[in-house]
């Protein structure tokens, strides 16, 4: 190990050392960036620094006071920074290179983040005014990110460089796009200053550390429903609190590090009992069973080596089954005790402990890409390089092995594929089992002051410590209820709200204290942190008083609402509630907007289940109920194909996350009005000469659905117990006509909501009304008197379609089940007869399901194809009036199916492939004399439209023997299939 402390390697001004706060190295290890108290960002050449690693000075050849042999040094060694940038107006607290090394992000206490990029065109520019020496490289500012309200403490890039996260003393977590540097999200979730940020090398999580004594882990992934660059979704995965309950608040940084294999997070400034420690968070369960103990003062920075190391232990009999050997990771920790400690996961004791290696607190560290060179900055202004010899830490494994270790967490798959897929969970579960087996050999006896080892594999009952009674009695608020005695001697006890005695203020819905987030376009744009006077720059002195007045006015009228420019609602955080109750901050109070979003998500899932999109064309329900995410592809296809001669208008609203509120089933079906024209039934009365059999009667059915019934007694808050009624606003069905209101006017009550009303007309005479509820209850009543014709029938699911065809009634549920009954012929018949009992449409629909596959070469592409379930729509359902068997025609391929009552299976009546042979023979020549003819014409008409849109290609018959034979065979087969379909019942 070599420790290089070069006198010119650091921040200084006028021969005085200036505090250095941050260092970062680029992806190829050729450039090192540093930032310090002087407000400068300096770029160093690592080759010039590492040259001194192999230098051995001899006393006879020392030519200067620093003991450096100038004769043996190469002329290309640069003993100063390549460039020094001074664009910040404050202390540079953090610098970070992007993963590809193109950009350099620097944060300062001037609340601004600068994005630097090397300018090759001005590499050899002359010395500028005020500079001691000309820069050898030129870095220019590409972006200026303004969003923080206080000092910026830490910066981190995502492993793929697509995201940039900055944290600061304003307790904000701001997420930027790593390409366009637009602000994506801002979260003010922490309750104190945020001092550390680190990304998961598997590109699934990032973690933040704060002075609120917590570490919060966030999961992020791409949204599938959006095509924007900023299509990321962020969720809080876990909160780690236990190791930091007594952590001191004197540290300026809490710089964490994630291990290169993705298994552990090292978090500084933790405590284990009375001593300071470094907490190790396990990725599998976010547990903190391991603590690194040894630092005498709070630790401020941790840094894992970016490479895995392989060691060969001849005494270890256990090897990996795959023969890949044993891997270990290297961790460096430092802090206020001025000591550098290097740990390894191979053993419990540290590898290296360098006491008083510097004369100030160590503020930041970074490893070179080779994993064997460490740079760290210090408050004494110096930057120190620690270089290890080959195989001193272990044998460095290839970077491909790093990627292989991250595969178990889905590092090779795009985050947009599945945020938490079953495959990924299985991989993590397998990795846990392998990890436990390999860690059995590391069960070394724990030294008393070095490390606290994790819990053993065997689950033992915990020792229960005796509870000590607290001598301080708890304050109990005695609750009293008001009791009144009525005139008849009965007691009435007024209910008492228990939460009213609590000191914690609970926001009440509908009060003026409710904080609502107002959307402003400017809230998503970068804004300067400097205040401009209201009346102009020239009146800045006069404008100060106006500023203070405005500030006092805002404090009076907008208390606890100083900063609403955040996206806490996405995480389920309500800023107003957290400010009112800081103690509940860790419990994550859920905001009203989040509850509404979760309710809409559940509501959307319910709508997609109750109203499948494949039944939209056949249903009589409103179209907007079917406009869910599953039919977006169908809508796009209809638009692109221009859908010639389509009589169905596609003016429906596509449902999004915000417009789902507009769909309310209770409101849509609160009132249902149906009008029917029929003739009067005179079969039971004497017909006089003045009677006209063609006189039409208009009957009106009005359904008034009542409110939803309360399931629990606690849900009914609008009534006192003494004033309640058991039967509240039932559903009313009012029937009337325009001929004689007194003769045919009645009201029927139902204890459920009615969704469908179907009048049954036989021989132009109104006979029955069929009513269907939301839950699949079907009731048939007499059109004359409202008398029940049959008992209530339950089909199990909500009804999509009710249809009458002759003497048959067909019902289709959202599960694709078809029921057909034969209606009675009054007065000879009185009861229904079942024809088809719950046959499924799945055999003909699932036959056309398409699940596109993902090729391996497209896995890493941003816009890779995502598997989607493509189910064809049902164009029409009909009933064979001869025997009641259902018929169906599909939209995509125009196939016609019929359910055979004899065979008890779906049979294909029309195969559109045979239409290709009907060049000269019109489809009118094929007739069966029943309802199949109409479906045949519809199928052929759709086939012709597909041909016009070039969706289907035609066969070209060139009058050769082969083509003529094919055409004749196809025509014959088509004719046979039509005839068989007409004969089979």
Curated annotation (Swiss-Prot):
Localization of this protein: Nucleus
Record's compositionally biased regions (Acidic residues): 560-572
Annotated segments matching region Disordered: 556-587
Stored Pfam families: Beta-prop_CAF1B_HIR1, Hira, HIRA_B
GO annotations of cellular component type: chromatin; chromosome, centromeric region; HIR complex; nucleus
Subcellular location, principal: nucleus
Bridged cysteine pairs (disulfide): none
GO terms for MF: DNA binding; identical protein binding; nucleosome binding; transcription corepressor activity
Keywords: Chromatin regulator, Nucleus, Repeat, Repressor, Transcription, Transcription regulation, WD repeat
Gene3D superfamilies on file: YVTN repeat-like/Quinoprotein amine dehydrogenase (2.130.10.10)
Biological process according to GO: negative regulation of chromatin organization; negative regulation of transcription by RNA polymerase II; negative regulation of transcription by RNA polymerase III; nucleosome assembly; transcription elongation by RNA polymerase II
Transmembrane segments: none
WD repeat placement: 13-54, 87-126, 147-186, 189-228, 248-291, 314-353, 357-398
PANTHER family attached to this UniProt entry: MEMBER OF THE HIR1 FAMILY OF WD-REPEAT PROTEINS, PROTEIN HIRA
Family: Belongs to the WD repeat HIR1 family.
The protein, known as: Protein HIR1
Gene source species: Debaryomyces hansenii (strain ATCC 36239 / CBS 767 / BCRC 21394 / JCM 1990 / NBRC 0083 / IGC 2968) (Yeast)
């Amino acid at each position: 190990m070599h420790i290089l402390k070069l006198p010119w390697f650091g921040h200084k001004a006028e021969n005085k050392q200036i505090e250095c706060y941050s260092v970062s190295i680029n992806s190829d290890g050729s450039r090192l960036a540093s930032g310090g108290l002087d407000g400068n960002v300096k770029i160093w050449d690592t080759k010039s620094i590492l040259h001194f690693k192999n230098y051995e000075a001899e006393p006879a050849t020392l030519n200067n006071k620093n003991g450096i042999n100038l004769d043996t040094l190469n002329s290309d060694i640069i003993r100063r920074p390549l460039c020094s940038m001074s664009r910040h107006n404050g202390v540079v607290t953090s610098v970070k290179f992007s993963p590809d090394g193109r950009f350099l992000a620097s944060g300062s206490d001037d609340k601004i983040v600068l994005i630097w990029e090397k300018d090759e065109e001005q590499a050899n520019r002359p010395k500028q005014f005020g500079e001691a020496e000309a820069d050898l490289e030129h870095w220019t500012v590409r972006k200026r990110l303004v969003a923080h309200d206080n000092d910026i403490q830490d910066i981190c890039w995502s492993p793929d460089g697509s995201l940039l996260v900055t944290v600061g003393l304003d307790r904000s977590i701001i997420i930027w796009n790593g390409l366009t540097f637009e602000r994506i999200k801002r979260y003010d979730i922490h309750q104190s200053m945020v001092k550390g940020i680190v990304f998961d090398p598997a590109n699934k999580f990032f973690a933040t550390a704060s002075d609120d004594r917590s570490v919060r882990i966030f999961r992020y992934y791409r949204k599938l429903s959006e095509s924007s660059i900023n299509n990321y979704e962020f969720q809080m995965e876990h909160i780690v609190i236990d190791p930091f309950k007594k952590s001191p608040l004197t540290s300026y940084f809490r710089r964490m590090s994630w291990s290169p294999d993705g298994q552990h997070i090292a978090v500084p400034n933790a405590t284990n009992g009375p001593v300071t420690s470094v907490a190790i968070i396990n990725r599998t369960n976010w547990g903190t069973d391991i603590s690194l103990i040894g630092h005498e003062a709070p630790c401020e920075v941790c840094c894992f080596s970016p490479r895995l190391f392989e060691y060969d232990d001849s005494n270890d009999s256990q090897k990996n089954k795959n023969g890949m050997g044993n891997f270990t990771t290297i961790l460096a920790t430092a802090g206020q005790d001025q000591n550098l400690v290097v740990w390894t996961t191979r053993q419990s004791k540290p590898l290296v402990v360098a006491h008083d290696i510097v004369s100030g607190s160590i503020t930041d560290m970074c490893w070179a890409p080779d994993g064997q060179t460490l740079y760290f900055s210090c408050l004494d202004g110096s930057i120190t390089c620690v270089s290890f010899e080959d195989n001193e830490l272990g044998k460095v494994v290839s970077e491909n092995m790093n990627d292989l270790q991250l595969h178990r967490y889905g590092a090779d798959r795009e985050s947009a594929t599945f945020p938490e897929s079953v495959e990924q969970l299985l991989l993590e579960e397998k990795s846990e089992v392998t990890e436990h087996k390999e860690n059995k050999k590391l069960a070394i006896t724990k030294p008393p002051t070095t490390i606290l080892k994790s819990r053993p594999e065997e689950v033992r009952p915990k020792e229960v410590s005796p509870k000590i009674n607290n001598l301080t009695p708890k304050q109990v608020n005695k609750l009293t209820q008001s009791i009144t005695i009525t005139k008849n001697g009965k007691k009435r006890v007024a209910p008492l709200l228990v939460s009213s005695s609590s000191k914690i203020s609970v926001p009440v819905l509908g009060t003026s204290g409710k904080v609502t987030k107002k959307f402003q376009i400017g809230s998503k744009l970068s804004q300067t942190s400097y205040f401009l006077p209201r009346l102009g720059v020239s009146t800045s002195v006069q404008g100060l008083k106006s500023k203070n007045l405005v500030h006092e006015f805002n404090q009076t009228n907008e208390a606890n609402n100083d900063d609403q420019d955040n996206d806490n609602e996405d995480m389920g955080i309500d800023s107003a509630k957290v400010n009112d109750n800081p103690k509940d901050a860790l419990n994550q109070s859920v905001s009203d907007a989040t509850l509404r979003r979760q309710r809409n998500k559940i509501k959307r899932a319910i709508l997609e289940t109750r109203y499948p999109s494949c039944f939209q064309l056949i249903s009589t329900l409103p179209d907007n109920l079917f406009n869910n995410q599953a039919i977006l592809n169908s809508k796009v296809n209809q638009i692109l194909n221009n859908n010639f001669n389509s009589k169905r208008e596609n003016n429906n609203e596509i449902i999004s996350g915000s417009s789902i509120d507009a769909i309310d089933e209770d409101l849509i079906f609160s009132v249902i009005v149906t009008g029917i024209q029929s003739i009067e039934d005179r079969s039971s009365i004497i017909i006089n000469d003045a009677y006209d059999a063609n006189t039409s009667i208009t009957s009106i059915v009005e359904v008034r659905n009542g409110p939803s019934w309360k399931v629990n007694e606690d849900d009914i808050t609008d009534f006192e117990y003494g004033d309640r009624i058991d039967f509240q606003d039932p559903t009313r069905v009012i029937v009337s006509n325009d001929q004689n209101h007194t003769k045919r006017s009645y009201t029927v009550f139902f204890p459920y909501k009615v969704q469908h009303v179907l009048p049954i007309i036989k021989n132009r005479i109104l006979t029955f009304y069929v009513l269907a509820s939301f839950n699949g209850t079907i009731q048939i009543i007499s059109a004359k008197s409202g008398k029940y014709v049959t008992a209530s029938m339950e089909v199990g699911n909500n009804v999509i379609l009710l249809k009458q065809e002759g003497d048959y009634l067909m019902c289709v549920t959202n599960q694709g089940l078809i029921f057909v009954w034969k209606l009675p012929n009054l007065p000879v018949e009185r009861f229904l007869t079942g024809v088809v009992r719950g046959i499924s449409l799945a055999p003909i629909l699932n036959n056309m399901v398409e699940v596109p596959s993902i090729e391996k070469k497209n896995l890493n592409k941003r816009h890779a194809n995502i598997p989607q379930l493509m189910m064809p729509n049902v164009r029409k359902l009909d009933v064979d009036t001869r025997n009641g068997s259902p018929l169906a025609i599909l939209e995509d391929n125009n196939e016609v199916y019929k359910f055979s009552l004899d065979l008890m299976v779906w049979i294909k009546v029309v195969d559109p492939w045979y239409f290709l042979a009907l060049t000269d023979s019109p489809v009118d020549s094929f007739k069966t004399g029943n309802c199949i003819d109409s479906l045949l014409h519809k199928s052929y008409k759709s086939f012709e439209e597909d041909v016009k849109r070039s969706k289907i290609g035609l066969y070209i018959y060139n009058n050769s023997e082969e083509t003529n034979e094919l055409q004749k065979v196809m025509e014959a087969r088509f004719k046979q299939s039509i005839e068989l379909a007409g004969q089979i019942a």
